[in-house]
Amino acid sequence: MIEILWFIFDSMLVLLLLALAWTTCSTQDVMRAVTLFIAMGLLLAVIWARLKAPDLALAEAVIGAGISGALLLSAIKDYPANVTVSDRTPLMRGMINLFTIALTILMSWAVWHGINMSDGVRLSERVASQLSISGVSNPVTAVLLNFRAYDTLLELAVVLTAVLTVLILNDKRADHKAISPLFQGMTRWLVPLLVITSGYLLWVGAHAPGGAFQAGAMLAAAMILLQLAYPSVHQGFNLYLLRLLLVIGIFTFVLVGLWMMVRNDDFLTYSPAQAGSLILIIETAATLSIAAALTLAYLGGRPAGWENGLKKNESDNHTYTDNEETK
């Protein structure tokens, strides 16, 4: 009986996910599409949890729905009120449909080809057999930060590239109006809890669901809440420290990899005795970089003084000297 109920529940999840995806793509109201996208992200988190993938469920809820939703809602402010998606011509609609069908066929073939080429040994079994030398007891962390650490390094590079593109293209969005004191009071309670939760996710990632991406997104959520409650809080940011935090993740990753290359002749190949400590160091630096990157992405561009803080100070000094000479 319980199995039947779970089957009905899973079937409803799949049908609801397909309905949300279709409605999100077909609606012409941008605000409605963003709201449905956030709801779809939360539903995906539930589905990942049902598939016994808690790390993916946590990442989907925090990043896929939470941070991405905040970014989309912030971007909507750049559009006029009641903006809608323009009607597509039949030719454009047909091209999109053909591309979607072709992509579906290609992905289906890739999955089928991968199953046929498999030797029958599941990846989880291979990871479990090598888990004792990984430095951690969580297989997901072992794969991301040890066995396939190079992939994670490239993911951090992708995040950095995306944020640098945002900083190059735009200045920071204009501050919104002040929020009610009730929301500000709630923020004073929520932000410390989010920071503590971020630290917990970072630490627990070695042996349970969590890790740098989830912790960094949680820390960025705390900064976004502060920005929403106190629109001018970003003016107190130390821009030089923010730049350092933005690159410290990749810098630490590469530094550890080069150190391992000198000692072991292989890039990012940790010795079993040092693997746990090195993974914790890398994850701590990556958490700070991810938090800084997502916070800057939410701001929508360069904060005031980002480009030429030193030049501004020099010009102020020259102005002061000229005024003294005039007097």
Where are the model-predicted features located?
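Alpha-helical transmembrane segments of multi-pass membrane proteins predominantly involved
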Residues: 1-327
